[in-house]
């Protein structure tokens, strides 16, 4: 923290902590700064394709019992996104009249005005989705960046003295 753009120590500089151990397991998530440094330092991405990223938005809903179909999984791609933007949706029917409703937008879109949140809201206006959620109640929500590059984008999964437990570049 506190490192300036040119690499010098700024007024808020704090030395990072030392991670020491026989083995260090890194679980930093998407595009983590430590994982990025490890990939570069140990050339872990040398034999892999560049990673791709998306933004996933998910809501947990409680729906009317007569609309619930335990175990049903639905995936879609495309709409409401335009043909030059990748992404898709998911609906997972859970126990207790609950469903996850989510939408992923690939983060390589060209339109600077595109709103992944707005596209998710549009997705929920689809007649089938709107009917499913009508009379229901949103219980929780969240969003996170996800890696989408596939197996060919996974870097080498070990480095001297450690291994990732959840990492992407």
Task: Please annotate each region the language model reported.
Residues 26, 164-165:
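General beta-strand structural signal in soluble alpha/beta enzymes
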Residues 77, 91-92, 142-149:
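Short amphipathic beta-strand and strand-loop transition segments with alternating hydrophobic
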Residues 36, 63, 134-135, 148, ...:
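Generic structural "secondary-structure junction" signal
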Residues 144-164:
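FAD-binding beta-loop-beta segment adjacent to the flavin cofactor pocket
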